Design a protein with these regions (language model features):
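Beta-sheet repeat architectures centered on beta-propellers
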Residues: 1-80, 90-104, 228-244, 250-485
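Short low-complexity stretches enriched in small and charged residues
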Residues: 18-26, 107, 158-168, 204-206, ...
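Beta-propeller and closely related beta-pinwheel folds
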Residues: 37-49, 82-93, 124-284
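Conserved beta-strand positions in repeat-built beta-propeller and related beta-rich domains
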Residues: 65-68, 108-112, 148-151, 202-204, ...
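Generic structural signal for short, solvent-exposed loop/turn connectors between secondary structure elements
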Residues: 118-137, 196-200, 205, 383-390, ...
Length: 485
């Protein structure tokens, strides 16, 4: 079997150790799994969504919040409308909402012009400005403090400043009182990301710093554990905690482990990404983790996306493999699924057959971590029918130093209970300087063979899969040598 190996678009197609195309799939330890499309969840906001966040109340109820340029919204779990719970905000094109939870308080920020907003679970029905708090691009919770970075207050903006609340008090920000304070981090550019936990991680354009609590009088120490290198794209950060922080720099994709940055895209996808990125729209990049599939995803506008995000780069951090998906969206986010009843299912579809997510899915049970996306000003979940997948093998040479004829291909794609639709194309060329010519797509017959025919010296096989399937592993070919040319 010729496997669908690791997707390595930065390497040569000929004898590539992996796959040359892996589109609309999730990388697995062996082969690939389907990538789900979008399922519409909410009604529309006023403008495109710039952030989605979900948390649970003490009784288990899922609370979902979202924000656009001028408003914050709360999802109504009965009719899935987006109810405005605060308005009058000012966000420029490069700003997204950032949310954190501290005790029963949900805190939102992201603008240079608007003070942090607070919502007390079980008490409040709207967000309100937190008195004395700054406006901030980035938020996190570090130990017993709400921490902000890249802040604006008292009519001044401090791009390299970290400021935090009083200890165990998200509503109190008086500097010098109850350990509330700030710290400027010099000579490292703007702060572009902030991650909380037992210690904090401050990502900057030219450095990464650890924020460690030490108590009075210093409160926190800031140690630059990495200098001369940092995160250059403010909306490209997602984490599983301070020891597993994913981000994008000018030289590619990295994971920070709490002490150092490890390249995860070098000689794999970095060149592909920067060649594909619409560089004039980098402010539309977003990043989120899908814990169910153990992947981190970067949504971005490609050169064919007219400045809007239309592609997602997918990294499986468990097996350290990549893939890509074509998915139009506004923003990516990690959230929770609300619980559904028979009545609320009617708001998703007028019939069971019209539901894009299987009724067997835990999506309907509620409370599970879920990858979400904004599209058409609405919240969507990434739980729909599988997108049409395209996988392509490495380029191989069946007959050394001579032409060969491919007479048929057997794809190894598994399925549980339904039969997916599959077609196969063979791409062939006689010289490495030529572009491959692909045969007409041929369907799988009853003999488990796709009778595709193509001649050349170098071949690759493309498999197109639609419908419901489980794993795509690789292919076998029926090839015979021909005379030298």
């Amino acid at each position: 079997m010729i496997p669908f190996g690791e997707w390595l678009p930065d390497q040569s197609d000929f004898q590539n150790p992996g796959a040359t195309i892996a589109t609309n799939v999730i990388p697995a330890a062996r082969g690939y799994r389907p990538f789900a499309g979008l399922t519409e969840l909410s009604a529309a906001a006023t403008d495109r969504l710039r952030g989605i966040y979900a948390t649970k109340a003490s009784d288990g109820t899922v609370l979902t919040f979202a924000g656009d340029q001028g408003k914050l919204y709360k999802l109504d779990n009965s009719d899935f409308s987006l109810d405005s719970v605060a308005s009058g905000f000012t966000m420029t094109s490069d700003m997204n909402w950032d949310f954190v939870r501290f005790g029963d308080e949900v805190i939102a920020g992201g603008s240079d012009a608007d003070t942090l907003q607070g919502f007390t679970i079980g008490t409040d029905s709207t967000f309100s400005a937190i008195s004395g708090a700054p406006a901030a691009r980035h938020l996190a919770v570090v130990r017993d403090f709400v921490v902000t970075a890249n802040v604006t207050y008292s009519s001044n903006t401090y791009r390299s400043r970290v400021r935090w609340s009083q200890i165990n008090d998200a509503a109190s920000w008086t500097l010098g009182s109850a350990q509330a304070d700030f710290q400027d981090i010099a000579d490292a550019g703007d702060i572009t990301g902030l991650v909380g936990g037992e210690f904090g991680v401050v990502l900057m354009e030219k450095a990464i710093a650890r924020m460690q609590y030490v108590g009075s009088p210093l409160i926190f120490t800031f140690e630059k554990v990495e200098t001369g290198h940092g995160c250059n794209y403010p909306n490209s950060v997602a984490s599983l905690g301070p020891t597993q922080v994913f981000y994008l720099a000018d030289d590619g994709f990295f994971m920070f482990d709490g002490q150092r940055s490890i390249p995860i895209g070098s000689e794999k996808v970095d060149r592909f990404f920067f060649d594909d990125l619409a560089i004039g729209s980098v402010d539309r990049i977003s990043c989120a983790i899908d814990p169910e599939n153990q992947v981190v995803m970067w949504g971005y506008p490609s050169l064919s996306g007219a400045g809007n995000p239309d592609r997602v780069l997918i990294y499986n951090y468990a097996v350290q493999r990549w893939s890509v998906a074509d998915l139009e969206h506004e923003v990516l986010a990690s959230s929770l699924t609300p619980a559904f009843s028979v009545e609320t299912l009617d708001t998703l579809s007028s019939s069971l057959d019209g539901l894009t997510t299987s009724l067997d899915s835990r999506f309907y049970a509620g409370g599970f971590f879920q990858l979400s996306a904004g599209k058409d000003k609405k919240i969507h979940t990434v739980t729909g029918a599988p997108l049409d997948a395209v996988l392509e093998t490495t380029e191989f040479e069946p007959a050394t130093m001579r032409q060969s004829l491919i007479r048929g291909v057997t794809p190894y794609v598994t399925s549980r209970s339904t039969t997916p639709t599959m077609t196969v194309q063979v791409g062939s060329r006689s010289r490495q300087i030529d572009s491959p010519s692909f045969s007409t797509a041929v369907s799988l017959n009853d003999d488990n063979n796709c009778p595709a025919r193509s001649s050349g010296r170098y071949h690759r096989v493309r498999v197109n899969v639609s419908g419901t399937w489980r794993y795509a592993l690789g292919i076998d070919v029926d090839a015979v040598g021909m005379g030298k040319r």
